Amino acid sequence: MYSSVSKRLVSVHILVVVALQLLFIPNVLSLNQTNAYLHHKCVNDQGTYNSGTPYEKNLNSLIRTISTLNLNFGFVHSSNGDAPNSVFIKLQCRGDSYFSKCRSCLATANSEIRRRCPKNKEKIIWYDNCVLEISSIDTFNKIDYQNNFFMYNAKDVSGDIELFNKNTRDLLHELKEKANIKSKKDFMYAAGEKGLGEKKLYAMVQCTKDLTPNNCNVCLNWIMAKLPKCCKGKQGGRVLSTSCNFRYELYPFLMI
């Protein structure tokens, strides 16, 4: 179902394997429960650490603390230790994947990213249900323009492609406005649908909850500008960074 491209072609072959697996997912419930691995990045800019060092001890302690939280709001930004051994963790779960699903995604993401990037101080991993970033630098309310990738549905749209692209843009921008309504329980997240004759277009947008509404707008506008490059004329697509993401499909993919 999916083909994929990333800014740095680190794990394209893995994404293609995931794409083929998604082709056989029988229903929406399975899609949400499988919590498919999407992508990861071992960042070298912040260097590495050794076993038994203060950085590793701070990281292990912070993970244990976060794992005890209820995660009812699907977001954590926390730190432990003082420079140069400070550790910062940011976890954002998808808007329909809070509570136990968020806790489960954290456990999976932490185990897998530390296996894939065992000694990198900065490492990021994306799953369907969450994104986990571990870093030695605080990224609170900062838009990450460096770490992003996109995936698209291999099936092309039939009919008027330009009209479909316009409807996709319109729905995503409508959801962007909804995501920034502070009174909403699911602030920084919005999902919806749009009728397209006999079909429906489903979409969602989300920002990490540490961003201000203005920065959320900036982030979503930035990734939405990638639509022509990533997903033009495709039945589905998504762009993900550590700060914000969107997805659209011609089938329901959320538990809403």
Swiss-Prot record:
PANTHER family: CYSTEINE-RICH REPEAT SECRETORY PROTEIN 29-RELATED, CYSTEINE-RICH REPEAT SECRETORY PROTEIN 38-RELATED
First and last residue of the signal peptide: 1-30
Family (UniProt): Belongs to the cysteine-rich repeat secretory protein family.
Gnk2-homologous domain ranges (all copies): 37-139, 145-253
Alphabetized Pfam families for the sequence: Stress-antifung
Protein's name in the database: Putative cysteine-rich repeat secretory protein 21
Transmembrane domains' residue ranges: none
InterPro entries per UniProt: CRR_secretory_protein (IPR050581), GNK2 (IPR002902), GNK2_sf (IPR038408)
First-listed, main subcellular location of the protein, grouped into a coarse class: secreted
Keyword match Nucleotidyltransferase: no
Gene3D superfamilies xref list: Gnk2 domain, C-X8-C-X2-C motif
Keywords assigned: Repeat, Secreted, Signal
Domain of life: Eukaryota
Cellular compartment(s): Secreted
PROSITE patterns linked: GNK2
Keyword set includes Signal: yes
Record GO cellular component, one term: extracellular region
Coiled-coil intervals: none
